Swiss-Prot record:
Protein name as annotated: Glutamate racemase
Domain of life: Bacteria
Keywords attached to this entry: Cell shape, Cell wall biogenesis/degradation, Isomerase, Peptidoglycan synthesis
Family affiliation: Belongs to the aspartate/glutamate racemases family.
Tagged with keyword Isomerase: yes
Length: 266
């Protein structure tokens, strides 16, 4: 049988993770749920984030008959994984900033972490730095605005280059040689980031590591059969430009998640 993989994010950022997983498991069935009604997660109260995500994902696991859940959001992963794993019987894979490989790659031992304010400031992130990059200088840059710029690009709207350069100016001025993209939205802007920061700055994200983890957790019998069905659910309406982009990713239609839920007992 083909695996049913649920990918969850606050917006379209999780598509960067989905792309990496789909490259490894092209025959799986994919269900993508994004909670765009509460975007961006990096600004939410922690308890609201935990309770809301656990409720949504638990419902989606049933709806999609998921064999595995990928929480394709750094802000959520730094908070909700223990609670989510406690209430689900299927494996849960979270996303963490690629601090360990960045520390190994950096020649200057000078890293930057670009993420939402929530991820940048959490103790979980500090623990990763202490564990894997204690010999490095790690500058942290928090931005929720960059999330919206990534959403604009996916909605086929122009990316505000002035805003982008304002956000990136302190990063460029710092002199770092390795930048960790600690939000799954940010690889969407990889071309724009690289263009402004220059080829001397390495950009790292966690997508390939997450894909490898998903493959390792699935039963071997789930990786070979032909499936390839795809379902997309949102918690708020989306614009026509985003619909067109999502169609190019194989999601031909978007369904309001609340409308999709099966009645209890059905």
């Amino acid at each position: 049988m083909s695996a049913n993989i649920l990918v969850f994010d606050s917006g379209v950022g999780g598509l960067s993770i989905l792309a990496a997983v789909r490259e490894q498991l092209p025959s799986a069935n994919y269900c993508y749920l994004f909670d765009n009604a509460r975007l961006p997660y990096g600004e939410l109260d922690e308890q609201e984030l935990i309770q809301g995500c656990v409720t949504l994902i638990s419902q989606a696991v049933i709806q999609c008959q998921a064999d595995i859940v990928v929480v394709a959001c750094n802000s959520a992963s730094t908070l909700i994984l223990p609670a989510l794993r406690a209430c689900l019987k299927v494996p849960v894979v979270g996303v963490v900033p690629a601090i360990k490989p960045a520390a190994a790659l950096s020649q200057k031992k000078h890293l930057g972490l670009l993420a939402t304010p929530g991820t940048v400031n959490r103790q979980y992130t500090q623990d990763l730095i202490d564990q894997f990059a204690s010999d490095c200088r790690v500058d942290r840059f928090g931005s929720s605005e960059l999330v919206y710029l990534a959403e604009d690009k996916m909605a086929q709207r122009p990316v505000d280059s002035e805003a982008l350069h304002r956000i990136l100016a302190p990063i460029k001025a710092s002199g770092l040689d390795t930048l960790i993209l600690g939000c799954t939205h940010f690889p969407i802007l990889r071309e724009e980031l690289q263009s402004y920061l220059g080829e001397g700055v390495h950009l790292l994200d966690s997508s390939n590591a997450i894909a490898a983890r998903v493959v390792s957790l699935l039963e071997p019998s789930m990786s070979g059969e032909i499936g390839k069905s795809q379902a997309l659910y949102t918690t708020d309406s989306i614009c026509e430009g985003l619909r067109k982009t999502l169609a190019a990713w194989g999601f031909r239609s978007a369904t309001a998640f609340r409308d999709s839920l099966m009645p209890i007992g059905s």
